[in-house]
């Protein structure tokens, strides 16, 4: 069966799953593409619904849930090559995920700090994607919440998201803010993000990319050898991540472990977060200086009154897929 046939069959049976909480927009765009209603089953953060067939098309991140579905290590379901996937990039509905952001005020008041943090972080990402096995070990040693085997799987898959764009082309300029991919994300956000406040909804519809991103810091650090970044205005900074240490964020742990932050005059505190909402709030209210979130979450937060700006785009393509059992869709 083709992807279209599988999607239509699952949609009409009401067995397409997603977590919601801002993760659903690509799935809704995919369903719209095939003229199906945008309803989906609420999926928990295990793959048990996929396992017991209550969810026939289950949402999964390539670097996390898909690995658990396929592999037999601790926490895995051991489906191996008996599953298929539908990729949001291939379907033309990809939305960009992990970035680096801060407040506009922080960027204006601390430009050298932003450049130094970006320079060292991107150096960490460069090392991590070139040495994923070592990067996974570093993350594990920082207090991983998953097994060493899953960390290794995650590192390999995250490296693909950092080095490949939505069209499948290789990206060598880590942290690049691809205007086409960002515009597609913004356009889909305008179509599918629902905001209760009418003023916020109107603000969202009027956003341009320049309202939510600033490419100047990335451009400066990619042209630098590190010697011309200037003295950081703030030498001790913090970044809040979504979860406990794992390879989704390996670039920051590598930068910390290798001393890259020290080299640019920064002391960096990496804070384990509790999800995208707390992250945007923590950065906006000054609890932390930098955060990692999906681009759509930043857009929504700014529409709602926050004053955040993306300064680098780490993941160059969507990591979201729909996974299904081949046996369920074999003619």
Question: Where do the language-model regions lie?
Answer:
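Extracytoplasmic/secreted envelope proteins and their assembly/folding machinery
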Residues: 3-4, 24-28, 47, 63-66, ...
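Short, solvent-exposed loop/beta-turn-alpha elements that line the ligand-binding surface or hinge
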Residues: 8, 12-13, 83-93, 165-179, ...
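Short, glycine-/small- and polar/acidic-enriched structural segments
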Residues: 1-42, 56-60, 86-87, 222, ...
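Pocket-lining segment of extracytoplasmic ligand-binding domains
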Residues: 43-145, 289, 296-297, 326-327
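Conserved C-terminal helix/tail region of periplasmic/extracytoplasmic solute-binding proteins
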Residues: 182-236
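Structured segments of extracytoplasmic/periplasmic soluble domains
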Residues: 9, 19, 30-34, 49, ...
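Short, surface-exposed acidic
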Residues: 37-40, 78-83, 145-160, 195-209
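Secondary-structure end/capping motifs
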Residues: 109-197
């Amino acid at each position: 069966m083709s992807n279209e046939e599988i999607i239509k069959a699952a949609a009409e049976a009401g067995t397409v799953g997603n977590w919601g909480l801002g993760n659903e927009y690509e799935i809704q765009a995919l369903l719209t593409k095939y003229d199906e209603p945008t309803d989906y089953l609420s999926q928990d953060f295990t793959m048990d619904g996929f396992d017991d067939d209550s969810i026939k098309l289950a949402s999964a991140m390539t670097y996390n849930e898909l690995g658990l579905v396929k592999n037999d290590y601790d926490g895995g379901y051991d489906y191996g090559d008996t599953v298929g996937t539908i990729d949001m990039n291939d379907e033309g509905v990809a939305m960009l995920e992990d970035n680096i952001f801060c407040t506009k005020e922080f960027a204006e008041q601390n430009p050298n700090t932003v450049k130094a943090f970006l320079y060292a972080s991107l150096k960490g990402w460069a090392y991590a994607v070139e040495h994923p096995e070592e990067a996974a070990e570093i993350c594990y040693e920082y207090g991983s919440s998953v097994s060493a085997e899953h960390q290794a799987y995650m590192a390999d898959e995250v490296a693909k998201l950092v080095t490949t764009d939505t069209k499948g082309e290789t990206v060598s300029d880590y942290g690049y803010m691809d205007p086409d991919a960002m515009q597609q994300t913004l356009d889909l956000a305008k179509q599918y993000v629902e905001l209760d406040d009418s003023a916020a909804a109107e603000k969202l519809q009027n956003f341009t990319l320049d309202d939510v991103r600033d490419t100047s810091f990335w451009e400066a650090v990619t042209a630098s050898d590190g010697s011309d970044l200037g003295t950081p205005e703030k030498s001790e900074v913090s970044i809040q991540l979504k979860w406990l240490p794992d390879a989704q964020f390996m670039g920051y742990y590598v930068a910390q472990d290798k001393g890259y932050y020290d080299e640019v005059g920064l002391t960096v505190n990496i804070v384990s977060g509790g999800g995208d909402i707390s992250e945007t709030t923590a950065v906006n209210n000054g609890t932390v200086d930098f955060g990692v979130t999906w681009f759509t979450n930043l857009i929504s937060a700014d529409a709602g009154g926050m004053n955040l700006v993306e300064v680098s785009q780490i993941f160059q393509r969507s990591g979201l897929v729909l996974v299904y059992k081949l046996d369920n869709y074999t003619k």
